Amino acid sequence: MRFLKLKEVMEKTALSRSAIYRKMSEDAFPKSINLGDRAVAWVESEVDDWMEEKCQMR
């Protein structure tokens, strides 16, 4: 399992920071994991699965 920081998620998905957090609040994007003081990350496989779902919806 690999964690992605926000910058990596933004690069991987081409989404902005605000779009990622908006989609999370709408339950339309994987939730972040709290790693400690002001540090969050996403599970890479969950982000990959989300991207695959988007591709299949076209």
Regions found by a protein language model. Name each.
Residues 1-19, 46, 53:
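Polyanion-binding surface elements
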Residues 22:
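Base-recognition residues in the alpha-helical recognition helix of bacterial helix-turn-helix
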